[in-house]
């Protein structure tokens, strides 16, 4: 975990020096920016990987969560690729995540929600699963890309 924190710190430093970050507040970046530099894209990819490794670290403590985590991880990767590399996945329905910041919040909220649920009763409830996916299964129509 210490290594992940060091990598995350370096990535944050690179992103702070980027002209994109200087000119645009990151929580207001639109879904698709053609001029988004490759450096920023790769930094965001590394940050996503860090969060997924963190998810894996937490879920590995809970045996019953492994299959749910695999599908959740795949969903995260699809959302990420659809947001920053839309030429790969143009028609996927998961277009609703408008910003990387919101995406991070969804991941962290999901980790907390499932971990709390597992520690209480060691099983999933339908409510917890629907909470995990409500961010991109029921998108506000104004957030869906054209």
Curated annotation (Swiss-Prot):
Primary subcellular site in the record, as a coarse category:
cytoplasm
The family database entries (InterPro entries) matched by this protein are listed as:
5TM-prot_SCHPO
What name does UniProt use for this protein?
UPF0742 protein C1348.03
Which GO cellular component terms, listed alphabetically, does the Swiss-Prot or TrEMBL entry include? cytoplasm; nuclear membrane
Bilayer topology reads: Single-pass membrane protein
Report the locations given in the UniProt record. Cytoplasm; Nucleus membrane
| Residue pairs linked by disulfide bridges in the UniProt entry | none
The similarity annotation says: Belongs to the UPF0742 family.
Report the domain of life of the source organism.
Answer: Eukaryota
Keywords, sorted A to Z: Cytoplasm, Membrane, Nucleus, Transmembrane, Transmembrane helix
**Segments passing through the bilayer:** 38-60
């Amino acid at each position: 975990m210490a290594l992940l924190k060091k990598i995350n710190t370096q990535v944050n430093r690179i992103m702070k020096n980027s002209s994109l970050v200087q000119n645009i507040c990151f929580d207001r970046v639109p879904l698709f920016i053609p001029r988004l530099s490759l450096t920023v894209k790769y930094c965001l990819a590394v940050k996503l990987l860090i969060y997924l490794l963190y998810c894996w670290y937490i879920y590995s403590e809970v045996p019953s969560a492994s299959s749910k985590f695999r599908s959740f991880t795949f969903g995260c990767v699809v959302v990420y690729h659809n947001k920053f590399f839309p030429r790969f996945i143009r028609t996927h329905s998961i277009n609703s995540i408008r910003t990387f910041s919101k995406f991070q919040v969804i991941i962290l909220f999901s980790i907390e929600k499932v971990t709390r649920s597992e520690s209480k009763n060691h099983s999933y409830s339908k409510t917890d699963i629907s909470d995990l996916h409500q961010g991109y299964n029921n998108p506000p129509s104004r957030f869906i890309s054209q």
